[in-house]
Amino acid sequence: SDEEKDAIGEISNICMGTAATTLYSLVNQKVVITTPVVEITNWDKLTAEYAKPCVFINILYKDGIDGNNVLILKEDDVKVITDLMMGGDGLNPAPELTELHFSAICEAMNQMMGSSATSLSSMLNCKIDISPPEAELVDMAGNIDVAKASDFLDKDFVRVTFRMTIGDLVDSTITVSYT
């Protein structure tokens, strides 16, 4: 319903605001995340919007909430974010993602979603704990096993989309999908 979408949007906005503050501390660049757009979608609709490979970061909720959270970032955005995290200027990121990049983006998302879970825990007055994130490069245009990306993507799910800017280096969309 519209009321449920509004509630999810409001909660997501608070959580991502906290996550943006955490990301700022990791990349030392101003991070701005806009008001979210909330919709019910499915795998086919989602993949139609992504022509290039994307990085899926899957985070399971261990306590307090049932389900998981999948963040979808563009490959180039991950390169810039991880370059900044490793002391670079973000202007000349590596041409290809390596295990070091996946480790760094998982650490960033672990800290961001950890702070987000803490905010959510305060709002709901219950303990919320997350699993360590797992990241993988997913070719959205190819045939992939939906279960490999996340076992909930084979049915309708909630998608929350934010516009995210990081300094003058990243102007992109971050997608968070919830079961």
Regions found by a protein language model. Give the residues of each.
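Composition-driven recognition of glycine/serine/threonine/acidic- and proline-rich low-complexity segments
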Residues: S1, K5-Y178
